[in-house]
Design a protein with these regions (language model features):
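Helix-loop junctions at membrane interfaces in 12-TM secondary transporters
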Residues: 26-37
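Intrinsic disorder in cytosolic terminal tails and internal cytosolic loops
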Residues: 117-130
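Intracellular juxtamembrane helix-capping segments at the cytosolic ends
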Residues: 47-61
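MFS-fold secondary transporters
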Residues: 21-25, 41, 114
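A late C-terminal transmembrane helix in Major Facilitator Superfamily
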Residues: 66-95
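Symmetry-related core transmembrane helices of the 12-TM Major Facilitator Superfamily/SLC fold
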Residues: 99-118
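Structural signature of the two symmetry-related core transmembrane helices
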Residues: 9-24, 104
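Helix-to-loop junctions at the C-terminal end of transmembrane segments
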Residues: 1-7, 92
Length: 130
């Protein structure tokens, strides 16, 4: 079923799942619920990652495909992750688990960007996605 979703739809799914996960995590759920939240993390990561790959495949010229993926990895796994971890750690130290709610902000920004992408992007054909 993922093959039927556009890059923007996958990014929207990932952003929505991330907002839900951070919001629920901030409520200090019981241990058993954290397992379900980690599954939601897997869904939000996978949807976002696949959404980017499909977006790049459709939007980035072939000769820059590796560069596009490298920039995404450097930003998402490096700079942005380091900043998010530092900010989250600061709020966690002061607010406990409620500090995780601050992570809703970057997730919401990503969701807003994905919705904007959905509104301005052309729809790739099924052949272009596969």
């Amino acid at each position: 079923w993922l093959g039927r979703l556009s890059p923007a739809a996958l990014l929207i799914l990932g952003g929505g799942g991330s907002i839900l996960r951070w919001g629920l995590t901030a409520m200090a759920p019981p241990l058993w619920a954290l397992f379900a939240l980690q599954c939601l993390h897997a869904l939000s990561f996978a949807a976002t990652y696949l959404g980017f790959l499909r977006f790049a495949a459709h939007s980035v010229p072939d000769r820059f495909a590796a560069t596009g993926q490298a920039i995404n990895s450097a930003l998402a796994g490096g700079v942005v992750m380091a900043l998010a971890s530092a900010v989250s750690g600061y709020f966690f130290a002061r607010l406990g688990t409620a500090g995780f709610a601050i992570m809703i902000l970057p997730a919401a920004a990503g969701l807003a960007a994905a919705i904007l992408l959905d509104r301005v992007s052309t729809r790739p054909s099924r052949k272009e996605i596969d």
